[in-house]
């Protein structure tokens, strides 16, 4: 058996509410929209990981999602320009990432990061 894909499923009464955050700001493509489910993604090959955490590191809560970007400072500027409140950071962490926490429109805590 070979795992082909891992999908994060996030429950929400309004599946399109995440569009401005994930599509407009982060630039993910809408791969599927059935009204009750909207799937965001990219045609680029990405590494998939599943993390099991007791804490978020540096005294932070465990985020619902972690999204690695190529330029965390550009992502921070885009989030702030779109009016999303930054809840932590930006911070250069001792394990080699620069990151910040932001809440998406669904109230989920998202860790946006880049490796240094």
Model segments located where?
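Short secondary-structure junctions
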Residues: 27-33, 86-89
């Amino acid at each position: 058996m070979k795992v082909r894909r891992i999908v994060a499923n996030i429950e929400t009464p309004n599946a399109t509410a995440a569009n401005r955050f994930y599509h407009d700001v982060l630039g993910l493509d809408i791969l599927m929209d059935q009204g009750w489910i909207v799937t965001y993604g990219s045609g680029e090959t990405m590494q998939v990981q599943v993390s099991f955490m007791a804490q978020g590191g540096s005294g932070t809560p465990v985020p619902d999602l972690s999204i690695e970007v190529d330029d965390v400072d550009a992502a921070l500027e885009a989030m702030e320009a779109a009016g999303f409140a930054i809840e932590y950071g930006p911070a250069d962490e001792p394990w080699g990432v620069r990151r910040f926490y932001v809440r998406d429109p669904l109230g989920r805590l998202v860790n946006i990061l880049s490796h240094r």
